[in-house]
Amino acid sequence: MQIAVCDDEKVYLDCLSRKIKACFKEFEIEISLDKYLNAVSFLEQHNQNPYDIVFLDILMPEMNGLDVANRIRNLSEKTIIIFITTENHLVYESFDYR
């Protein structure tokens, strides 16, 4: 299973990546996890080889996570998108992306 985590805050990126790895390990599921500090580098890779699951920060410079989700959906309906945010008001906007 190919997983990507995209967050512009390195501390959150590393912490979430560790937790994701631990959860999948607990259920004995092998994963490959890539980390990205910006949406542009993530999209370059995702466009070449789409991920199965993407953990995506909503608030990022250059391109926000909601715009990235639109680009993911244009490429693949199968990719599971899980939004990450500390802003409660953005949670409801993320419901429009399936």
Regions found by a protein language model. Name each.
Residues M1-Q2:
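Non-catalytic signal-transmission and effector/linker regions of two-component phosphorelay proteins
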Residues V5, I31, L43, D57:
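Generic anion/oxyanion-binding catalytic loop in active/binding sites
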Residues C6-D7, Y36, V54:
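Conserved sequence signature across two-component system core domains
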Residues D7-E9, T86:
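Acidic di-acidic motifs
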Residues K10-D34:
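Two-component/phosphorelay signaling modules centered on CheY-like receiver
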Residues A22-E26, Q48, N74:
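Secondary-structure boundary motif
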Residues K35-S41, G65:
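Helix N-cap/capping motif at the beta->alpha junctions
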Residues E44, P50-R98:
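CheY-like receiver
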